[in-house]
Design a protein with these regions (language model features):
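N-terminal helix-turn-helix DNA-binding module of bacterial transcription factors
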Residues: 1-48
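Short beta-strand segments enriched in small/hydrophobic residues
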Residues: 4-9, 43-58, 156, 164-171
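Secondary-structure boundary/capping motif
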Residues: 16, 61-62, 91, 176-177, ...
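Generic recognition of short, well-ordered alpha-helical segments
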Residues: 19, 37, 63-65, 94, ...
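Alpha-helical recognition/docking segments in bacterial nutrient-uptake
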Residues: 22, 37, 45-155, 159, ...
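Bacterial carbohydrate/catabolite-sensing allosteric modules
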Residues: 30, 71-76, 100, 124-131, ...
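Short gly/ser/thr-rich secondary-structure transition/capping motifs
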Residues: 30-36, 90, 110-112, 213, ...
Length: 300
């Protein structure tokens, strides 16, 4: 047998020999026992809940990031409280306030628009915060190199002889997808002796197939001789592909098409979509590890 103190250490992640840990683990699994988290909080003063604020839970990348976060939190017996903003800035601010009132130990904020109001709200947070997908000032961040990714996509097109490249981007309120990806494409064009700043481009209102199709139709009118299209996301590229086919253009032959995200659907299309992969699950895992380290250092 083992003592009640040993069981308590096991349930709370305390020091314990591997032999005792294995014995207790077997009993816990057989009985299906789960500790009362509210009682644990009252007894230890330690909050075991982390808030996660996401811009759109229907997004493939958001799903991958939250899966990574959950895997790390589960390993440390933390629960995840999820808030879905649907890109509503006021709802995002509301979640930041509400989660603190609900006594979360920390918050992970998935990339959003950086506004003075959000900057002030993050500054006023009473709990540790980690941001993913964006580079915000004065807060821990985990983000991808969007500029390099877009530059490499455009360079691939240039290497295949494309010279009249257009770009379907996103709102520049979003630095990562709106500014960094657009600048990456322009970098590649400038390096090739083309004028990146004069590149025909259009901003879609949402990362949807419908918007990709609409933007592509407009660019075909403006630039009928285009031979390459770089899109801000794969989903937007799928819509662009539809518009190109409707216009009688042959994707992969007379016009190149690329997107960002390495969506599973891209591999099923014929021809396949040129894309770049972001390891979003690892982004979520790293964000959770950073937050857990901050909580450990704070004694939370």
């Amino acid at each position: 047998g083992v003592s009640s103190a040993a069981v308590s250490r096991y349930l709370n992640g305390g020091p314990l020999s591997e032999q005792k840990r294995a014995v207790i683990h077997e009993v816990v699994e057989k009985t299906g026992y789960r500790p009362d988290t509210a009682a644990q909080t009252l007894r230890t003063g330690k909050v075991n809940q982390v808030g996660v604020i996401a811009p759109s839970i229907g997004s493939q990348s958001v799903g991958q990031i939250t899966a990574g976060i959950a895997s790390e939190l589960d390993a440390k017996s933390y629960l995840m409280l999820l808030g879905n903003t649907e890109l509503d800035a006021q709802r995002e601010l509301g979640y930041l306030t509400a989660m603190q009132r609900n006594h979360v130990a920390g918050i992970i904020l998935l990339g959003s628009y950086y506004t003075p109001q959000l900057a002030q709200a993050l500054k006023n947070c009473r709990v540790p915060v980690v941001v993913t997908g964006q580079r915000f000032q004065d807060v821990a961040c985990v983000y991808n190199d969007d500029r390099t990714a877009a530059r490499e996509l455009a360079q691939r097109m240039l290497d295949h002889g494309r010279k009249r490249i257009v770009y379907i981007g996103g709102t520049e309120r979003d630095d990562a997808t709106g500014v960094q990806r657009r600048e990456g494409v322009q970098d590649a064009l400038n390096a090739a002796g083309l004028n990146g700043e004069q590149m025909p481009r259009i901003c879609c209102n949402a990362f949807t197939m419908e918007e990709g199709q609409r933007c592509m139709q407009e660019l075909l009118v403006r630039c009928p001789d285009l031979d390459g299209v770089v899109c801000v996301t794969d989903t937007v590229a799928f819509g662009a592909m539809r518009a190109l086919r409707e216009a009688g253009r042959h994707v992969g032959q007379d016009v190149g098409l690329a997107g960002v995200g390495d969506s599973w659907a891209g591999s099923m299309m014929e021809p396949g979509l040129a894309t770049v992969r972001f390891y979003q699950k690892q982004v979520g895992q790293e964000a959770a590890r950073i937050l857990l380290q901050m909580l450990e250092e704070n004694g939370s």
